[in-house]
Amino acid sequence: MELKISIVTCSDTHDLAQDEAGAALEELIEAQGWTVASHVVVRDDVSEIGDAIVEAADECHANVVLTCGGTGLSMRDVTPEATRAVCEREVPGIAEAIRAYSMTKTRRAMLSRAICMQRGHTLVVNFPGSTKAARESWEAIADQLEHAAQMTAGGGHTN
């Protein structure tokens, strides 16, 4: 299955040209032979993040939306809240897997509030905003994204 993956970077301080974590994710997606359906940078704002997720899922028809940034403890970090506002179902195992893998790299991973949810047939996964942490999050789940996308599209389990 060829995946279409959208990237939504959440940052008050970066634009698309400065988005190193998003650019790294683009490279990783393309290295898998998958398509980057869209890549936008939005402010750390619940409405803007939610709108970008909806557009990626509903207009770009992404199988997966990766948000990047806004998952920490700062009051401006609102990506999990924005994700919950526009999605229907939690997929806790993916966020748990990212945290477990990241904890082998840094104990600070326990401070992440990142979540994973499903919006219709689209999986929405929150990644941290640093390039290193975004790469590690990708490493933690990339091998399961195709199966997850098949499942959210209504497919059955494969062995």
Feature-to-residue mapping (PLM):
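Non-catalytic beta/alpha edge segments that cap or flank active sites
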Residues: 1-159
